[in-house]
Regions:
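Short, compositionally biased low-complexity segments enriched in polar/charged residues
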Residues: 55-87, 100
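Bacterial N-terminal signal peptides that target proteins for export
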Residues: 1-12
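Short Gly/Thr-rich strand-loop-strand
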Residues: 101-138
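A short, solvent-exposed beta-edge/loop patch
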Residues: 82, 125-158
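Mature extracytoplasmic domains of secretory-pathway proteins
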Residues: 79-113
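C-terminal motif of bacterial Sec signal peptides marking the signal peptidase cleavage site
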Residues: 20-24
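Bacterial signal peptide processing site
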Residues: 26-29
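Post-signal peptide N-terminal segment of mature Sec-exported envelope proteins
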Residues: 32-53
């Protein structure tokens, strides 16, 4: 009983952290990217300026497997740790239209929840990194960044 309560409490805490992150980093509500925001440039900066546990590799070719429920014509770029021993990753999803953004945000939240559950079983010391992931929406774009370098990530996505 005590373990079930702890699992429920942790799940609620994770969801609350994700929701607060989304609220703090949300873009405009009409799905339009602000003129000052260049998503491709932000992605490049996130790759080069943010500190990750190890080198990230382009794993975009496996993104369809991890995100099978994305809206039609959604685009995704995904970089993950080469060895797979750390959860650090950078994901940029782009919806084809404004209505896709909510589905992309849901996919991002679901991905982080599933990643947290996996880590609890085999690498629990990495769970806080995922719980503190930055999820940011700007226009048609949704970014997910799992790293300890949260401040740099937020500054780039601002």
């Amino acid at each position: 009983m005590k373990r079930s309560f702890l699992n429920v409490f942790c799940a609620v805490a994770i969801l609350a952290a994700i929701i607060l992150t989304l609220a703090a980093c949300g873009g405009d509500k009409k799905g339009q990217t602000t003129a000052a925001f260049d998503a491709e440039n932000a992605f490049s900066r996130l790759l080069s300026e943010v500190k990750y546990a190890e080198t990230l590799s382009d794993t975009s070719s496996s993104a369809d497997f991890m995100f099978s429920d994305l809206p039609q014509n959604a685009e995704i770029k995904m970089y993950t740790c080469e060895s797979g021993s750390h959860p650090d990753e950078l994901i940029m999803m782009k919806g084809a239209k404004e209505e896709d953004v909510q589905a992309l945000e849901t996919a991002a939240k679901t991905h982080l929840t599933e990643l947290t559950a996996q880590l609890r079983d085999y690498n629990p010391q990495e769970v806080p990194r995922v719980e503190n992931a930055v999820v940011c929406t700007n226009g048609l774009y949704v970014f997910v960044c799992v790293t300890d370098d949260v401040e740099t990530t937020k500054a780039i996505l601002k």
